[in-house]
């Protein structure tokens, strides 16, 4: 934590802010202790259950296999943490039986090391087609003329290559992965809660450290240091000051903390692959004006409207409708027109900061 704080300070904090203030911050952050040492990562039994649920759903929907590229879904199913490049690394999940992992020959040991499920691993050399091992695997199982589900983030060149290798197969949208990932288990919820606890702890530490003249980068450095000290992996720190707080994702104009102005912080972290995404708003160095308090109270009440509207069996879009109706009665909008709610009411979260389902007009998922 100490090294993190100094590194960010050296990169972004003005010299006039560093000396006594940074030393005080260093001392304060040393008092923070990790709160994630006792967390339980997703284990083999949970991943086995994920595969079993996926295969059961595939059989019910007539999907013979799924293709998954590196990213959250690959980690979700297999534990493989990998990056995307022009060299294909992928997981193929059959409707029954053992999955296949495909990777470049020289990466096999790394894939073996990170693989958290029973799976066959096949490789391809630099001069070979990476789709040949997949085609051979599916042909051996009589699936080369089947329906292959393509996970929604798979890149086009991978789809195109698979299509060429399996001309008789039918490539379709994966109807399984999103549906399974949307339903969080108790273990997943516990990790998400811990990530939220880390972010809230970082907020509580950072808030009193904010001083006049600080920039968004300065405040972000404090949040990053606190998040790391508390045992989280920082994902993002969006700090909006003054007028920029009116922009959902900020402004490129220079900003600094000034008394009486709004500080809006939108920050999140990861704990064992699961994320938090929490915003907090305050007025620095002065009591809020009547207008600032009025708008803050209206937004807080809008959140309560959303909570009351979000019930089991209710379409997600109706939550957005309820909140938008409330704001319009106050004179905001209409619709997305500012001043008012210029974006959807909310989004899902899990291994990614934005996941289905969205709280947005027209969303029928219940």
Regions found by a protein language model. Name each.
Residues 4-366:
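Active-site neighborhoods and metal-handling regions in enzymes and metal-associated proteins
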């Amino acid at each position: 934590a100490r090294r993190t704080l100094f590194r960010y300070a050296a990169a972004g904090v003005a010299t006039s802010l560093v000396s006594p203030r940074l030393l005080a911050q260093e001392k304060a952050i040393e008092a923070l202790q990790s709160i994630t040492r006792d967390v339980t990562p997703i284990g083999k039994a949970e991943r086995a259950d994920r595969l079993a649920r996926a295969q059961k759903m595939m059989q019910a929907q007539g999907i013979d296999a799924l293709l998954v590229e590196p990213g959250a879904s690959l980690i979700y199913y297999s534990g493989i943490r990998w990056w995307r490049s022009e060299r294909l690394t992928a997981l193929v999940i059959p409707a029954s039986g053992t999955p296949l992992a495909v990777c470049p020959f020289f990466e096999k040991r790394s894939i073996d090391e990170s693989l958290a499920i029973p799976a066959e691993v096949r490789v391809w050399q630099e001069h070979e087609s990476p789709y040949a091992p997949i085609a051979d695997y599916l042909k051996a199982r009589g699936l080369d003329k089947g329906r292959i589900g393509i996970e929604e983030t798979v890149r086009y060149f991978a789809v195109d290559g698979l299509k060429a290798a399996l001309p008789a197969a039918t490539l379709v949208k994966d109807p399984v992965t999103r549906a399974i990932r949307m339903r969080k288990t108790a273990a997943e919820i516990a990790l998400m809660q811990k990530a939220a606890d880390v972010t809230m702890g970082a907020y509580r530490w950072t808030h009193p450290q904010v001083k006049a003249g600080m920039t968004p980068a300065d405040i972000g450095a404090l949040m990053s240091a606190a998040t790391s000290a508390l045992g989280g992996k920082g994902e993002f720190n969006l700090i909006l000051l003054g007028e920029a707080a009116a922009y959902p994702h900020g402004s490129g104009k220079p900003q600094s903390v000034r008394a009486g102005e709004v500080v809006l912080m939108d920050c999140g972290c990861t704990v064992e692959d699961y994320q938090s995404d929490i915003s907090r708003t305050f007025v620095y160095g002065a009591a809020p004006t009547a207008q600032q308090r009025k708008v803050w109270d209206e937004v807080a009440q809008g959140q309560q409207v959303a909570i009351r509207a979000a019930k089991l069996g209710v379409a997600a879009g109706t939550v957005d409708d309820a909140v938008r109706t409330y704001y319009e009665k106050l004179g905001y909008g209409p619709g997305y027109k500012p001043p008012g709610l210029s974006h959807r009411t909310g989004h899902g979260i899990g291994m990614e900061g934005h996941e289905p389902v969205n709280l947005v007009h027209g969303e029928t998922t219940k």
